[in-house]
């Protein structure tokens, strides 16, 4: 063998078997940035049709977590696939930089504004802190192989973006959607500020559940409503009973609310202390049961409408409150009578407005009752629950109480219970200019993926309250408005003033607002009557208006609107909604054409990531150990529309899949050794049939892969890629061609035909991989022949190219078409089982020691005969003869194909030292006593002729 070793076409490539990604990827990254890969993509795609995926900004605080990695990798895969599809798809990453979490981090270092540092100094410290956080997260994202405008990202704290946020506020005000109101809003007493809907999370909490008596102010008037005749009125005090789980709100009670069409019953409680109580008829038994009242009877009935405006005594204050009517009253639980405190609940506020009730708010921003609050001044509301219960007992107003566990709103930052508290705030009104209906209409014009996203956001928009956009914070974009000191009306020239302020902020940042001398801008006369608003904007407003402040403003987008928003499914109540509402308020349309959502990352058992459980998978750990391409392949392998599971075992499976794909690519590259596409490509019509079949399988795979990318169905991309590499190539084609590739005449037709197929296929394969396994695709690209099929130099990067258009397939009308090769593969699979049995029975060693006789029915025999002597190369045996089924020998074995029996014989022929086939002519050729005639031809002669395989 040693004398013929140099005549073999042994595979050779600089592309290593082991990825060693953790070490190699940072080196590739360095080259990408030194050679400005992102800039090269932009240049290559200039003037193409645009695709804009607008980045939802992560918050500039802390290290990135696995959820961030999932989100950014999905975006990067989609953008790279769009680039390969011929789109100009710029990616400008963003960061959300204002708000409370940053304030809290800075407070730990320098104290609260106004103590050790001025408000201006505090804002500057916040800006510095946020900038540092952005840089840290940026490097982590780049390490994942995310390409984008990293040198010029958008940050909501950039002066120009802050100015554009102010301009967006002005546009919304100009369109009639801004509202100043004294309304109950979600309020965190730890933040000391209002919260947006998206900043509220629900957790279980134990509260006091109480039934409270409100005595009738005029018993006779109440009894008359129940139509009771004299002598049949019953005995004891008359009370209406409310149920609540927030006793601390009772000081702000200003009414009891009933439903107009509900039936209410006046119940006579019997015993030593008789009394008469009013509750909804449907709930009477449950009220009596929990109060432990066994002896009672009904005195009379009335509807809620009958009782409207009847007066009842407040349980511990000296004033009376009316019975009012509201549609929000249900019989799901409680008493059918709702305690109504307009200052502490949105429904209470709304119904209170209809009746002109006082909006009492006895609670300060820190959650403590104000000094003039009778009985409870200075107490924190949640601690005051016990005090309220004691007062109710003293007054004889407490019918029943027990501990009650229920879902309750909490601050997402502090994880503490929040309250509803009426305060003067600025709102984007959903009603006053028809914004809600406009938004619901706009939703219908958007493609939501998954499709349940549409009904989800429709329900949220339909039921949401006014959007409270004001915050009482230091680090935020100011609500840059001037209001009249007495009437609180906006300055009549607000539109012009907002633009002037925006221009100042564009030069100096938000501090310009606080430094602004009102008289300089308004003139002395107006300055005497108007004052600056000192509130800041909700950070959801900051990020929500980036469709205008960033997408419309950045020249990279060339005036194009966003095609896609892609975030976690929680953003239906967050960024998707704030973006939608602000865009409709500003432009009358949605800010996006498509919205794609992904689920949350959980562990292998479906549990949320938790440090206490110890199941947190950090993306930095994965890249340092396995490499970013493994993480990227994990992301693409999942059905990301639901929960996405990750664990060491799951990542190991991704690493195994990666190795199979890498090894397939390596086989292609190693067998292109010595191949020059400019001179060595064989014309399609002259190629060996099996090689054309392989290119055709690549074409079919490419069509499915491109479609899956277009549908954002990434796990289908990975499945098709794996099937192509492992089954179509690995289990069949690559196995069959090894003999021809290694032993055919070097540079001869048989080898070059095979190399032509391998070259075309790897040209396609590297592009399929590029969006997902970006580092490995780049590595493959650099190991490929420097010239392309047309003789032109290869692009420096695969990412600047488009899907390979040089693939071709077999025509269905051909004799050896796809159906033919499908049948051949089935025969090969059946034969392999018999060869395996023969090996196990020690009849043969390897398959090349076998000679086969295939007894086949006429149809199959004619197909097999078309391959002639080349059938043995497909079956990997030294001989394969086809005979009619009628001549079947006793030694022939049945297969799992009808009409096919196979006899396996051990060859008696000598083994060729060069190709290892056993043929009768080994040792018969002068000067070449150890090799077969085929090898002699491949070494010294014209080379063997292959037509089929």
Swiss-Prot record:
The cofactors required by this protein are: Zn(2+)
This protein's GO CC annotations: cytosol
Q: Where in the cell is it found?
A: Cytoplasm
Main localization (coarse)? cytoplasm
Motif placement: 'HIGH' region: 58-68
Q: Which reaction does it catalyse?
A: tRNA(Ile) + L-isoleucine + ATP = L-isoleucyl-tRNA(Ile) + AMP + diphosphate
Which keywords accompany this UniProt record? Aminoacyl-tRNA synthetase, ATP-binding, Cytoplasm, Ligase, Metal-binding, Nucleotide-binding, Protein biosynthesis, Zinc
Residues binding ATP = 611
GO molecular function terms noted in the UniProt entry: aminoacyl-tRNA deacylase activity; ATP binding; isoleucine-tRNA ligase activity; tRNA binding; zinc ion binding
Question: Could you tell me the EC number(s) of this protein?
Answer: 6.1.1.5
Name the positions where L-isoleucyl-5'-AMP binds: 567
Q: SUPFAM superfamilies this protein is in?
A: Anticodon-binding domain of a subclass of class I aminoacyl-tRNA synthetases, Nucleotidylyl transferase, ValRS/IleRS/LeuRS editing domain
- Motif segment ('KMSKS' region): 608-612
Tell me how this protein assembles. Answer: Monomer.
What task does this protein carry out?
A: Catalyzes the attachment of isoleucine to tRNA(Ile). As IleRS can inadvertently accommodate and process structurally similar amino acids such as valine, to avoid such errors it has two additional distinct tRNA(Ile)-dependent editing activities. One activity is designated as 'pretransfer' editing and involves the hydrolysis of activated Val-AMP. The other activity is designated 'posttransfer' editing and involves deacylation of mischarged Val-tRNA(Ile).
Recorded domain comment: IleRS has two distinct active sites: one for aminoacylation and one for editing. The misactivated valine is translocated from the active site to the editing site, which sterically excludes the correctly activated isoleucine. The single editing site contains two valyl binding pockets, one specific for each substrate (Val-AMP or Val-tRNA(Ile)).
Name-wise, this protein is: Isoleucine--tRNA ligase
């Amino acid at each position: 063998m040693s004398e013929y070793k140099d005549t073999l076409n042994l595979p050779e490539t600089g592309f290593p078997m082991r990825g060693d990604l953790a070490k190699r990827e940072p080196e590739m990254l360095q080259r990408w940035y030194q050679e400005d890969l992102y800039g090269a993509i932009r240049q290559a795609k200039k003037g193409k049709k645009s695709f804009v995926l607008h980045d939802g900004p992560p918050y500039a605080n802390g290290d990135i977590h696995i959820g961030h990695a999932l989100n950014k990798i999905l975006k990067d895969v989609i953008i790279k696939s769009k680039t390969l599809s011929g789109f100009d798809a710029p990616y400008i990453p963003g960061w959300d930089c204002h708000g409370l979490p940053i304030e809290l981090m800075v407070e730990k270092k320098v104290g609260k504004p106004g103590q050790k540092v001025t408000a201006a100094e505090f804002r500057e410290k916040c800006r510095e802190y946020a900038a540092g956080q952005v840089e840290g997260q940026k490097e982590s994202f780049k390490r994942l192989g995310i390409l984008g405008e990293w040198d010029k990202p958008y940050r909501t704290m950039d002066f120009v973006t802050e100015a554009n946020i102010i301009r967006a506020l002005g546009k919304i005000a100009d369109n009639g959607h801004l509202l100043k109101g004294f309304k109950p809003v979600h309020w965190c007493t730890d933040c000391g500020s209002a919260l947006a809907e998206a900043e509220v999370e629900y957790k279980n909490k134990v509260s006091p559940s109480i039934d409270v008596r409100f005595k009738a102010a005029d018993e006779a008037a109440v009894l008359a409503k129940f139509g009771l005749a004299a002598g049949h009125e019953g005995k004891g005090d008359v009370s209406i009973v409310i149920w609540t789980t927030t006793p601390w709100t009772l000081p702000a009670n200003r009414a009891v609310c009933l439903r107009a069409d509900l039936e209410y019953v006046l119940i006579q409680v019997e015993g030593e202390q008789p009394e008469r109580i009013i509750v909804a008829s449907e709930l009477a038994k449950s009220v009596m049961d929990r109060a432990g009242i066994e002896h009672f009877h009904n005195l009379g009935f009335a509807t809620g409408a009958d009782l409207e405006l009847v007066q009842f005594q407040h349980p511990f204050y000296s004033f009376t409150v009316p019975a009012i009517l509201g549609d929000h009253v249900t019989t799901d639980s409680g008493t059918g009578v709702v305690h109504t405190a307009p200052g502490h609940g949105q429904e209470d506020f709304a119904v209170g407005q209809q009746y002109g009730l006082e909006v009492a708010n006895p609670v300060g921003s820190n959650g403590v009752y104000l000094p003039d609050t009778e009985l409870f001044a200075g107490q924190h509301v949640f601690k005051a629950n016990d005090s309220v219960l004691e007062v109710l007992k003293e007054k004889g107003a407490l019918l029943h109480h027990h501990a009650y566990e229920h879902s309750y709103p909490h601050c997402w930052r502090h994880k503490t219970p929040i309250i509803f508290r009426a305060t003067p705030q600025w709102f984007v009104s959903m009603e006053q200019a028809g914004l809600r209906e406009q938004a619901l209409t706009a939703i219908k014009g958007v493609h939501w993926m998954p499709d349940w996203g549409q009904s989800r956001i429709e329900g949220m928009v339909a039921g949401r309250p006014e959007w409270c956009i004001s915050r009482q914070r230091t680090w935020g974009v100011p609500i840059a408005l001037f209001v009249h000191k007495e009437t609180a009306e906006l300055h009549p020239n607000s539109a012009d003033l907002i633009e002037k302020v925006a221009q100042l902020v564009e030069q100096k940042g938000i501090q310009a607002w606080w430094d602004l001398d009102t008289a300089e801008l308004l003139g002395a006369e107006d300055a005497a009557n108007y004052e600056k608003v000192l509130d800041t904007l909700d950070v959801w407003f900051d990020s929500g208006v980036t469709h205008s402040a960033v997408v419309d403003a950045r020249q990279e987008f060339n005036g194009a609107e966003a095609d896609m928003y892609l975030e976690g499914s929680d953003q239906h109540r967050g960024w998707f909604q704030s973006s939608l509402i602000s865009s409709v308020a500003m432009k009358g349309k949605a800010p996006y054409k498509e919205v794609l959502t992904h689920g949350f990352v959980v562990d292998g058992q479906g549990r949320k990531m938790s440090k206490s459980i110890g199941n947190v998978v950090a993306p930095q750990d994965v890249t340092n150990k396995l490499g970013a391409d493994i993480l990227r392949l994990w992301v693409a392998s999942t059905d990301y529309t639901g929960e996405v599971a990750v664990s060491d075992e799951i990542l190991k499976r991704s690493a195994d899949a990666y190795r199979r794909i890498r090894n397939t690519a390596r086989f292609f590259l190693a067998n292109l050794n010595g191949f020059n596409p400019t001179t060595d490509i064989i014309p399609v019509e002259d190629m060996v049939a099996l090689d054309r079949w392989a290119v055709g399988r690549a074409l079919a795979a490419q069509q499915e892969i491109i479609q899956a990318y277009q549908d954002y169905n990434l796990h289908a991309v990975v499945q098709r890629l794996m099937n192509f590499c492992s089954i179509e190539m690995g289990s069949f084609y690559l196995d069959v061609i090894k003999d021809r590739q290694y032993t055919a005449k070097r540079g001869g037709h048989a080898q070059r035909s095979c190399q032509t197929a391998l070259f075309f296929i790897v040209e396609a394969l590297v592009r399929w991989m590029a969006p997902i396994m970006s580092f490995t695709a780049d590595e493959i690209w650099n190991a490929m022949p420097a010239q392309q099929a047309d003789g032109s130099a290869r692009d420096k990067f695969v990412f600047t190219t488009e899907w390979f258009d040089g693939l071709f397939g077999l025509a269905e009308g051909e004799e050896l078409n796809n159906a033919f090769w499908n049948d051949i593969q089935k025969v090969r699979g059946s034969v392999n089982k018999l060869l395996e049995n023969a090996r196990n029975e020690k009849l043969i060693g390897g398959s090349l020691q076998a000679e086969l006789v295939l007894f086949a029915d006429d149809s199959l025999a004619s197909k097999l005969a078309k391959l002639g002597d080349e059938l043995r190369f497909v079956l990997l045996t030294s001989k394969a003869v086809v005979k009619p089924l009628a001549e079947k020998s006793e030694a022939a074995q049945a297969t799992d194909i009808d009409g096919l029996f196979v006899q396996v014989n051990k060859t008696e022929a000598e083994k060729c030292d060069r190709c290892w086939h056993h043929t009768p002519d080994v040792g018969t050729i002068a000067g070449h006593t150890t090799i077969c005639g085929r090898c002699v031809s491949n070494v010294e002669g014209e080379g063997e002729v292959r037509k089929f395989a």
